[in-house]
Amino acid sequence: LRPAAPPINIKIDLTLPSKEPVLLEASRREIIHPYSGDLGASVSCYSLEEIMAEKIRTVFERTRPRDIYDIVSLRALTNMDDVLSALPDKFEIKGIEPDIEELVERRNTFAAAWNNSLRHQIADLPSFDEVFETCIQFLGGLELIK
């Protein structure tokens, strides 16, 4: 019990596999913690490729600057062949037709939310223009996106 402190709240999001199917094999990751001693435990989690495929899908259906930032950040960390293998199903499941021009048309909406959404999460937040242009070039280079 912690009588002097507010209760600890933990949010757990359980999504049905029929709504958000995992298409790529999960990976096992060691739990990193700030305490001394070896915990020696790992957890099963989404692969970076699954996360990247989800981020690419979601950027075409919602306007959250975090998705653009994450896509640009994950580019060098993911196997794009695996990402591209999952994308057609990711789009189809949600009924999304990825349209790069429509994404560019939402530029001002992304820009308006950039600082308020991210500056409290990312210490050295890069400029919106730089990240947005990099993201558009990257996505425009993918064969699946028109």
Q: PLM features: residue spans?
A:
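Structured mid-to-C-terminal alpha-helical surface segments
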Residues: L1-K146
